[in-house]
Amino acid sequence: NFASEKLNSSYTVIKKNKFITLSFDDLNIKDSDYYYQINHFNHVWEKSNLFKSDYIEGYDDNLITNYSNSFNTLVDYKNFRITIPNKNLKFKISGNYSISVHDDYGNFLFERKFSILEEKTKINIEFFKSKNLKNYNSHQNLDITVNCSNCNNLTGSSSQLKLVIIKNNQWSNKIVLSEPDFFFDNKLIYKNISYRGGNEFYYFDNSSINSTNL
């Protein structure tokens, strides 16, 4: 189970300085030690080149000390819980992260991914019908406006600004945009982004179904 304070889903997003909790059960009732590590990723979930000290404050590879034994159950187990940030580890920056768990022999067990966000700007999104007849029933168009100060400093060949669009928290269908179509001092504009989204609710048949019986 992996959840933030207000969200419980397979992919979790939290605001910076908020808490996230990972819990899991161990059916092996022997005394086993488990540890967790934190890794940072870029905008397409490739491991970043940052040092640990660049994105976390404290220690990595921490022992999980919060656990409880089952009581009055058919199968005995231990429940382990990790809440971060904590006294041993805090996040310095926002971005994409994973928390991985391994045993005391260094064997990898599993990992869960999550993102930490900072609301530094406002984004406006408008949805339209696809203008391409071939995609009319399967795609939607998006216009996105990013409001920012000194937007000109965010664009160019060396820019690290990336706009990533995902649907229903599924990164497999992501769209990554590196440059806006138009940029001004206070806004970046991305036009006519075509996205498979389904238009099944666009059409409404309001014809009368009343008929005269003969």
Model-flagged regions — what are they?
Residues 43-45, 89, 103-109, 170, ...:
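Short acidic/polar inter-strand loop motif in beta-rich domains
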Residues 110-114:
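Edge beta-strands of extracellular beta-sandwich domains
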Residues 17, 31-33, 92-96, 197-206:
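Extracellular Ig-like/FN3 beta-sandwich strand-entry sites
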Residues 1-40, 135-148:
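Contiguous beta-strand segments within globular domains
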Residues 63-66, 71-85, 184-213:
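Aromatic sugar-binding surface patches on proteins
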Residues 30-58, 154-179:
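Extended low-complexity, serine/threonine- and proline-enriched intrinsically disordered segments
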Residues 116-139:
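Low-complexity, Pro/Ser/Thr- and charge-rich linker/hinge segments at domain boundaries
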Residues 74-102:
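Ligand-binding face of N-terminal immunoglobulin V-set domains in extracellular IgSF glycoproteins
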